[in-house]
Curated annotation (Swiss-Prot):
Similarity remark: Belongs to the ARR-like family.
Miscellaneous comment: Subject of targeted degradation by the 26S proteasome. ZEITLUPE (ADO1/ZTL) is the F-box protein that associates with the SCF (for Skp/Cullin/F-box) E3 ubiquitin ligase that is responsible for marking APRR1/TOC1 for turnover. CUL1 is the functional cullin for the SCF(ZTL) complex. APRR3 binding competitively inhibits the ADO1/ZTL interaction.
Cross-referenced SUPFAM superfamilies: CheY-like
Region (Disordered): 161-200, 239-260, 316-338, 368-395, 573-618
Induction: Expressed with a circadian rhythm showing a broad peak in the late day and early night. Negatively regulated by LHY and CCA1.
Gene Ontology annotations for the cellular component aspect, listed alphabetically: nucleus
Organism lineage string: Eukaryota, Viridiplantae, Streptophyta, Embryophyta, Tracheophyta
Name of this chain's protein: Two-component response regulator-like APRR1
Pfam entry (one): CCT
Tissues in which the protein is found: Expressed in leaves, flowers and siliques. Restricted to the vasculature.
Domain notes: The N-terminus (1-243) is required for interactions with ADO1/ZTL and APRR3.
Species this chain originates from: Arabidopsis thaliana (Mouse-ear cress)
Gene coding for it: APRR1
UniProt biased composition (Polar residues): 161-174, 187-200, 246-257, 324-334, 375-389
Keyword Transcription regulation: yes
Coiled-coil ranges (or none): 588-610
């Protein structure tokens, strides 16, 4: 590795020879290695071997020393004491102290940082870390408001580095041995940015969304509005301790920037970055809104938008035949999207707001088609839906009621009792025509509040007290749509449904005979909720009794074994002439077995007639 060549590569921008480092290490070998590395990086190095020599050097050459790089184990107690002394001294706290050690232990690192260390390096030291030591000096002077050393040889322009770039981290900022890949290679449009965009101020100029527009080839040309907090470099002569008067507008360059390949990492405190507030999805810029309320979409996003919108239109245009022409995304008094020369699609603000509504319609495949466009237009029986989605048994209530239902609502408010009608049209010839000349539509089950008790029943067997079964109506539906179960309140015991309408102030009854062909078989009637609960309760009790029975059996077996081996507390059973001596006076085992069987039978009988079962039977 040619360190000299690498360091010379960075001398075009940063002059490290103006930085003086005080190196302290009690190990001669380590001291020589670090001294060589710092010298090859063009730093001015002063080497000492003890904490006392560090204090003496600071007292003698304090104003000329910029950075202190010290070993923590001098021993450690002295190293910590030296660190505490330097960070608490008012004249020396401008000097950043960087501790180094072979111990990579978290408690030691935390203790050093709490005492005021600027950084903690683990040996062996790497070139990147040494090349970046000057940034600690720059931060400290900047934080304290002191004058800065003129280390930058040339003015340069900022090239914002990607956060995901492996070179953008806290250890290789401004280093020369990294893979210095500029973002120009990945974004060729960045070089075409105007000089005015590069000089925008953070404090005065907002980040405009138009900077992220499309170029001629459809690629993104958004510029990262990055400005540096850099004071004028021509007025830095003077003492290091002289306070610097801050610029009233620090977010501007003192001179015209020049293009370069210097990578500035975002994690560094050397520059202030303006983070882009525009979110990016899938490598594309989001839609942009200009001043006149138009929405600009990229070519790829616009194509996806057209596909999704076309799906929604194709799935619902059959339900909208009342309109002569199906226009794509035509809103009230607004024009459709326009396509300009560069491939961007412009949407008005109203159309942009309805973009998500139309897209969700296409994705859901028209879960609920518009059943009516008003009180004067209805769908005919011959209309079909492209995707016949199976609707659930419970339909949502339509926003616009048919004319007949509205009249029923009005009549109910006037005091007349009306039953919701269900049009049973078996064919087009049997369609009922009202006074207005419109054909009666296939009405869906509407449930009007306050008319009567309109309860959706699961089956006809739910109401046995009426002595009949209410059939499921099977009216004619549009092709591709499944039938809905129609339920009627069980107040009419005949197999005829009374359709009531109010004409000329009088109530007339129009009877429609229902065919019992749609009745479900009685063996398919589901068990009601009460029966299911009772069955589950019985099953649970049986299992509980079985578990208790097993426990009792285990207890009886243990008792039998214990009684067959009688013993006195603290003594063993004595044997006389090979015969067991029963000290407890228990009967023989044969007699005991008979009595045990009788006890088990009694327990089983008691279990069969338990209080829980008696309560259940009653």
């Amino acid at each position: 590795m040619d360190l000299n060549g690498e360091c010379k590569g960075g001398d075009g921008f940063i002059d490290r020879s103006r930085v003086r480092i005080l190196l302290c290490d009690n190990d001669s070998t380590s001291l020589g290695e670090v001294f060589t590395l710092l010298s090859e990086c063009s730093y001015q190095v002063t080497a000492v071997k003890s904490a006392r020599q560090v204090i003496d050097a600071l007292n003698a050459e304090g104003p000329d020393i910029d950075i202190i790089l010290a070993e923590i184990d001098l021993p450690m107690a002295k190293g910590m004491k030296m660190l505490r002394y330097i960070t608490r001294d008012k004249d020396l706290r401008r000097i950043p102290v960087i501790m180094m050690s072979r111990q990579d232990e978290v408690p030691v690192v935390v203790k050093c940082l709490k005492l005021g260390a600027a950084d903690y390096l683990v040996k062996p030291l790497r070139t990147n870390e040494l090349l970046n030591l000057w940034t600690h000096m720059w931060r400290r002077r900047r934080m304290l408001g002191l004058a800065e050393k003129n280390m930058l040889s040339y003015d340069f322009d900022l090239v914002g580095s990607d956060q995901s770039d492996p070179n953008t981290n806290s250890t290789n900022l401004f280093s020369d041995d990294t893979d210095d890949r500029s973002l120009r290679s990945t974004n060729p449009q960045r070089g075409n940015l105007s000089h005015q965009e590069n000089e925008w101020s953070v404090a005065t100029a907002p980040v405009h969304a138009r900077d992220g527009g499309l170029g001629a080839d459809g690629t993104a040309t958004s510029s990262l509005a990055v400005t540096a907090i850099e004071p004028p470099l021509d007025h830095l002569a003077g003492s290091h301790h002289e306070p610097m008067k801050r610029n009233s507008n620090p977010a501007q360059f003192s001179s015209a920037p020049k293009k370069s390949r210097l990578k500035i990492g975002e994690s560094s405190a050397f520059f202030t970055y303006v983070k882009s507030t525009v979110l990016r999805t899938n490598g594309q810029d989001p839609p942009l809104v200009d001043g006149n309320g138009s929405l600009h979409l990229h070519r790829g996003l616009a194509e996806k938008f057209q596909v999704v919108a076309s799906e929604g239109i194709n799935n619902t245009k059959q339900a909208r035949r009342a309109t002569p022409k199906s226009t794509v995304l035509r809103t009230n008094g607004q024009d459709p999207p326009l396509v300009n020369g560069n491939g961007s699609h412009h949407l008005h603000r109203g159309a942009a707001e309805k973009f998500q509504v139309v897209a969700s319609e296409g994705i859901n495949n028209t879960k609920q088609a518009h059943r009516s466009r008003g009180t004067e237009q209805y769908h005919s029986q011959g209309e079909t839906l492209q995707n016949g989605a199976s609707y659930p048994h419970s339909l949502e209530r339509s926003r616009t009621l048919p004319t007949s239902m509205e009249s029923h609502g009005r009549n109910y408010q006037e005091g007349n009792m009306n039953i919701p009608q269900v049009a049973m049209n078996r064919s087009k010839d049997s369609s009922q025509v009202d006074g207005s000349g419109f054909s009666a539509p296939n009405a869906y089950p509407y449930y009007m509040h306050g008319v009567m008790n309109q309860v959706m029943m699961q089956s006809a067997a739910m109401m046995p007290q009426y002595g009949h079964q209410i059939p499921h109506c099977q009216p004619n539906h549009p092709n591709g749509m499944t039938g809905y179960p129609y339920y009627h309140h069980p107040m009419n015991t005949s197999l005829q449904h009374s359709q009531m309408s109010l004409q000329n102030g009088q109530m007339s009854m129009v009877h429609h005979s229902w065919s019992p062909a749609g009745n479900p078989p009685s063996n398919e009637v589901r068990v009601n909720k009460l029966d299911r609960r009772e069955e589950a309760l019985l099953k649970f009790r049986r299992k509980r009794n079985q578990r208790c029975f097993d426990k009792k059996i285990r207890y009886v077996n243990r008792k039998r074994l214990a009684e067959r081996r009688p013993r006195v507390k603290g003594q063993f059973v004595r044997k006389m002439n090979g015969v067991n001596v029963d000290l407890n006076g228990q009967p023989d085992s044969a007699d005991y077995d008979d009595e045990e069987e009788e006890e088990e039978e009694e327990e089983e009988e008691n279990r069969d007639s338990s209080p829980q079962d008696d309560a259940l039977g009653t």
